[in-house]
Regions:
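Catalytic core regions of nucleotide second-messenger enzymes
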Residues: 46, 75-93
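Conserved metal-coordinating catalytic motifs of nucleotidyl cyclase and c-di-GMP turnover enzymes
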Residues: 4-7, 49, 113
Length: 146
């Protein structure tokens, strides 16, 4: 089991500039994009604001990181409402990835994915950071930008 923590970059600026209806339209479009491009066994949930989690059963860390980067890249190439007003002229996401360890709870797993997500934000956004399988550390997996 792996999890992706996904956050829309600069979402507050999008809402402030274009209004909440545009922000809501972008959230719906992102949810639809993920739904169409993930497996039927995967679960997508919005956990607040502009943050989503994706549960990936039967998926190891490397596979989850590939899924995360595929989604990140698709978002970057997709036209979103208000995206033209975002930095770089496009909507982007940052993603934290973690896989369940035998000794941890679901809350621990989510906390590690969330920590990796915030590391992705700190590294400049529009990238994927994967939490390592060793306790407490995260390593950069992908940082691709156009």
């Amino acid at each position: 089991m792996s999890i992706l923590a996904i956050d829309i970059d600069y979402f507050k600026a999008l809402n402030d500039r274009h209004g909440h209806p545009t922000g809501d339209a972008s959230l719906r479009k992102l949810a639809g994009l993920m739904t169409r491009n993930l497996r039927r066994i995967d679960t997508i949930a919005r956990i607040g604001g502009e943050e989503f989690v994706v549960l990936l059963p039967r998926t190891n860390l490397s596979e989850a990181a590939q899924v995360a980067d595929k989604l990140r890249s698709m978002v970057e190439r997709t036209e979103f409402p208000g995206g033209d007003g975002q930095p770089g002229g496009m909507l982007t996401v940052s993603v934290g990835v973690a896989s369940l360890r035998p000794d941890e709870t679901g809350a621990d797993l989510l906390a590690r994915a969330d920590k990796a997500l915030y590391e992705a934000k700190d590294r400049g956004r529009n990238c994927v950071v994967s939490a390592s399988q060793s306790a407490g550390s995260a390593r950069s997996l992908t940082r691709s930008r156009i």
